[in-house]
Amino acid sequence: MFAEKTVVITGASSGLGRQLACDLASRRARCVLFARNEAALAKVVAECEKAGGEAIAVVGDVTIPEDCERLINEASARFGGIDIYLSNAGLSMWAAFEEVKDLNIFRRLMEVNYLGAVNGLHFALPHLKQSRGHIVAIASIQSKIGVPYHTGYVASKHALEGFCRALRYELEGTGVTVLTVHPHWIRGTNMRTSACSGDGQSVGDRKLAHNGESISAAECSAAILKAIRNRDTELIIPAKLRLVPWLKLLWPSLLRRKVWSKINRQDK
C-alpha cells in the first residue's frame, strides 16, 4: 500500500525517523524527510534511494510554523499531495523536578513534542483530507502513565495524546485515520543522550543503558507500518504494555512498583 505514496516524516535524520524512512523507501514510498541537521538528512536520503524509494530533504525546525508550512509546500509541489504525515520529532528529559534549574526545559519539551506536531499537521491536514490519508503521531507509553524524572516529557506526550484523541473525533467521516503510537524505550536512537538534564544541557553519556525490555527501532517501525496498513488508531509497543492502562485503573500500587523498578534499573 505504500508504493507511490507521499510520506512526510519529521525527525527523520536519525533513530526511529530514519528507520521508518528506509523501511518506507524499500516499499517504494516517496519520502519527504524533515529535520534540522542537513548533513544527516542527506545521508538518509541516500539510504532511501539505495533502498529503492524516492526521497527529498527539507531542512527546518518543527517548532517554527513557517518552517512547517514550507515543508508541506515543498512536499506538495514535488509530489502533488501528501498521503501520510508521520510526526516523529521528539525531545526527552531525565531530571527530578526539584533538580531543574532552567524552567525553559518545560517550554522546549512542549514546543517540540506537542506544538511541533500541531504546527505540521495544521498545514498538512487539507492535503490529508484530500487523499483520505493517515496521521501518525509518535507519543510514548509515558503518555499513559506518569514516570519519575520525566515530568516535562510526560506532560508533553499527554498533551499530544489528548490532541490526537480530540482530532480523531473531528475527522470522523473524512477518511483520515489518526494513529497514536505508544512505544517503550527504543534502542538505536539518540533520545537518551540528547535528553534534557536539570540544567537544560543534554544528559550525554550519563544514561546510556537500555534494559532488556527496550525495543529496537526496526521492531518499532515494522509495527507502525502494519498499524498504518490496518488503519489502526492506537498502537502500544511491545504488546504486553497494553496491560498498563488496566493496571493503572485496577491495580495502581502494582503499576507504581513496576515503574520504580524500571527507573531504578535504568539509573544504575
Model-derived features: where do they sit?
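The beta1-alpha1 cofactor-binding region of Rossmann-like NAD(H)/NADP(H)-dependent oxidoreductases
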Residues: 38, 59-70, 103
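Residue(s) in the substrate-gating loop at a strand-loop-helix junction
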Residues: 140
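Conserved glycine-rich Rossmann-like NAD(P)H-binding loop of the short-chain dehydrogenase/reductase
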Residues: 27-44
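Conserved glycine-rich cofactor-binding loop
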Residues: 13-14
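SDR active-site lid
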Residues: 173-239
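Active-site helix of classical SDR
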Residues: 121, 156
